[in-house]
Regions:
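Active-site pocket scaffolds in enzymes
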Residues: 1-97
Length: 97
């Protein structure tokens, strides 16, 4: 398990740490949202109000021999573990070096 990312909100002190066995993390933001999408509770989703951390192999892995392989043979199983640890800044462990 490797430390992959930390998101921190200085206004609230909320923290999300991401630890994973995957070699990469894709970060997606809600920059394309304009308030036209409404959630089940009636909340609208607007620009800069959300993000996601998606752990995965690198998207170009099949084309880059120096990247970790994404080949999975028919008899093989794939296992991956990702942990999202939620905290406040008062309870933060130090970042790995």
């Amino acid at each position: 398990m490797t430390f992959a990312a930390r998101a921190y909100d200085p206004r609230t002190g909320r923290v999300i740490d991401c630890l994973t066995t995957e070699p990469g993390v894709q970060v997606y933001t809600s920059n394309g949202m304009n308030g036209s999408v409404v959630g089940s509770s009636g909340t609208t989703y607007r620009q800069t109000e959300a993000f996601t951390l998606e752990t995965q192999h690198f998207p170009e892995s099949p084309n880059k021999p120096n990247f970790p392989s994404t080949e999975l043979k028919p008899v093989q199983e794939f296992h991956s573990t990702t942990i999202f640890r939620f905290a406040t800044d008062a309870s933060l462990p130090p970042l790995p070096r």
